[in-house]
Amino acid sequence: MVKRSCPSCGLEAGSEKKERGNPISVQLFPPELVEHIVSFLPVKDLVALGQTCHYFHEVCDAEGVWRRICRRLSPRIRDQSSGARPWKRAAILNYTKGLYFQAFGGRRRCLSKSVAPMLAHGYRRFLPTKDHVFILDYVGTLFFLKNALVSSTLGQIQWKRACRYVVLCRGAKDFASDPRCDTVYRKYLYVLATREQPAVVGTTGSRACDCVEVYLQSSGQRVFKMTFHHSMSFKQIVLVGQETQRALLLLTEEGKIYSLVVNETQLDQPRSYTVQLALRKVSRCLPHLRVTCMASNQSSTLYITGGTLIPRKQVPKAAELRAPDPPDQGGVYFEVHTPGVYRDLFGTLQAFDPLDHQMPLALSLPAKVLFCALGYNHLGLVDEFGRIFMQGNNRYGQLGTGDKMDRGEPTQVHYLQRPIALWCGLNHSLVLSQTSDFSKELLGCGCGAGGRLPGWPKGSASFVKLHIKVPLCACSLCSTRECLYMLSSHDIEQCPVYRDLPASRVGGSPEPSQGAGAPQDPGGTAQACEEYLSQIHSCPTLQDRMEKMKEIVGWMPLMAAQKDFFWEALDMLQRAAGGAGPDTSTPES
């Protein structure tokens, strides 16, 4: 193509070219117009644009932009009024929400995504049961995600997980089911909710009361309901015990623990009866402490404390004698109800009282605990510095310490820090962590039978990187016998912030009195290395030695990046040795 020009209009053309050479600044446009334009960008591009300069950072961070994006993502959402940045928070919650799962059995080993309810305002927590999955959003709506038979793209009928949804109830605060890892025991779903109660005689208007509603997980039918006095407000519910003696533990807004006992085998009978709500012993023995969260399993319960509930001088003398000086925040207390679990967790039965299962036992830790994970006979704790401590049964290597020795006190896993989430299963553990480039990875240890540690069918005594693609905004996880679930959500107001370890603790060894995080015995480490060398020497060929070395690297307590380096280096050496000739298969002297 040839561009022609007229000599008579050469001056005009030159001036037009000069005008085109002057750039027009975007700052000359009204801010409202720029905000309206950038609001049509995808969220990922909008965030990238906001990182280019100070001007676009202010434009892309405006609440008006995020309000338009939020209404585009969730047209049915109401006006937001809570929090410092309500529209930005709501938009990011709905943009990042997702439930992903990977089945352990079958030929397809890929990550799948469940159906996304349009009515859901972000995902706060989830719970898989025997047949379905339940999800709670940030406005208290509980969704019932059903498994169903659907037609595939090839016209075949196949069974899909969490492919249809219905609203189970609204006004929910929390929910729980049987705490065992096997979902076959989760027959009922207990929902803690707020309901408007009609006015009684002599009063005007209705009152909001907390209640516990029990639903059948198979059909979503409500079979039982118990209502509490309007003066009591709860925020968390957990279950403990067997079906015939199911204990419901309820945490109040003030940090008190109440409990009641129901018989699940009689819940489906249409009758009315009264249950007794009593103050749990941990709140009676430690009345000045405020419990912030609970975790439970079949035969144990764990409490993490917050700030003091009442001034120390107002604590009764009897309570002061029972608890002379407990920690005000981040302390951990245990209830263990069976001798077998007690022995697995603490290595002894010395302090176990079979007549008093509710007596709280304090765990000694060097720092405040932020969150925890509780399995059947082992547990994991994460402190304010991002350190991971494991305790309990280690028969399958589920503590990640590099060996299979039980731990009767919290022991630090030195090569893992600052996790996003922690999960303790029946005989394996999972850690969700973030790499330096902000991508997520899933690490696991323990028993690998049944595919529960993807890529490691033989299991591992130390945390290894699992062969699974983790969503970018994954925040929590759950593992069952059949499936691995990961919840994707990002809340800009609830990001965990770890403290930097003081300089006095960085290079030095922990105090002898702490016990938790004490370094392993050097003699034991040397003995293990000698055993590894003897195993390598017993291999008949060089290729077998390479494979054995890869296996040993997986056993050793190394960081994930270090293990990846050694595995890649061994693969390179193995490929190079494979083409060197027939003499490479002869073992060296």
UniProtKB/Swiss-Prot annotation:
Q: Name one GO biological process term.
A: axoneme assembly
Q: Which SMART domains match?
A: FBOX (SM00256)
> Mind naming one GO cellular-component term on file for this protein?
SCF ubiquitin ligase complex
Protein species of origin: Mus musculus
Quaternary structure, from the entry = Directly interacts with SKP1 and CUL1.
Where, in residue numbers, are the RCC repeats?
386-435
A Pfam match: F-box-like
Q: Which PANTHER family match?
A: F-BOX ONLY PROTEIN 24 (PTHR47004:SF1)
Keywords, in A-Z order: Ubl conjugation pathway
Q: Where is this region: Disordered?
A: 506-526
Cited function? Substrate-recognition component of the SCF (SKP1-CUL1-F-box protein)-type E3 ubiquitin ligase complex.
**Residues covered by the F-box domain:** 23-69
Under what name is this protein listed? F-box only protein 24
Domain of life, per the record? Eukaryota
Alphabetized CDD domains for the sequence: F-box_FBXO24
